[in-house]
């Protein structure tokens, strides 16, 4: 783990393993131009980029107990106290775990698992994680999920360039699934029933190993 400012002597970590039948691995090897990208919304920062968050909060001379100077969607943040939402509650909102819907999609979803060509966790590295899934194909995000309010606040308060935001944070999209175009609508309907707010966000391209975005400033060709 890379946790500057927090871990000085002890780093305690854990590992979880999953398995598939031999030959049914989803590695990205079956990706092809035109595959549809389905984005699953995040619940917040997902425990990534917190060093930058702390830096911005300190720079603003704010406190984690301060009432958030922005509003968030009702019910998105898990509450542990009464009253108005604080910055601490928002930035420590538990990470959404996609294990159950993803495993169910593979095992009993609306299409054969062979149509699921890649799955990407948008974690540290942001959208550049997509580059890890194929050596030559690219990814174009032309309909990004809505940016969560806390990310907009961090960008404004920290005067952070949009590309750096998408490299550091998930920006509201915690996972991407790449599926065959012919099953994309049925998969989207199925996934949306389990992770509300999911949407088609783009396609796999054949314009080189690069991630491009609706905002031309957001572009990655290295991880």
Positions of the model-derived regions?
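Ubiquitous "structural anchor" signal
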Residues: 26, 31, 57, 132-133, ...
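Phosphate-handling active-site elements
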Residues: 24-27, 62-65, 140-141
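Glycine-rich anion-binding loops of enzyme active sites
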Residues: 1-53, 203, 214-215
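Glycine-/charge-enriched secondary-structure boundary and capping motifs
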Residues: 5-10, 80-223
């Amino acid at each position: 783990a890379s946790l500057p400012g927090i871990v000085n002597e002890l780093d305690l970590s854990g590992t979880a393993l999953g398995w598939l039948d031999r030959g049914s691995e989803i590695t990205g090897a079956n990706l092809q131009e035109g595959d549809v990208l389905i984005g699953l919304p995040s619940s917040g920062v997902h425990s990534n980029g917190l060093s930058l968050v702390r830096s911005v909060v300190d720079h603003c001379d704010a406190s984690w107990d301060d009432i958030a100077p922005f509003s968030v969607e009702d019910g998105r943040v898990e509450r542990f106290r009464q009253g108005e939402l604080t910055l601490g509650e928002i930035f420590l909102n538990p990470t959404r775990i996609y294990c159950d819907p993803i495993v169910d999609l593979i095992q009993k979803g609306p299409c054969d698992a062979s149509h699921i060509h890649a799955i990407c966790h948008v974690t540290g590295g942001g959208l550049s994680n997509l580059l890890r899934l194929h050596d030559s194909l690219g990814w174009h995000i032309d309909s990004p999920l809505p940016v969560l309010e806390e990310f907009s606040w961090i960008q404004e308060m920290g005067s952070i360039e949009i590309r750096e935001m998408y490299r550091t944070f998930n920006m509201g999209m915690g996972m991407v699934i790449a599926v065959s175009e012919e099953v994309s609508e049925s998969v989207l309907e199925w996934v949306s029933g389990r992770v509300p707010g999911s949407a088609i966000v783009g396609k796999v391209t054949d314009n080189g190993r690069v991630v491009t975005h609706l905002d031309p400033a957001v572009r990655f060709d290295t991880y």
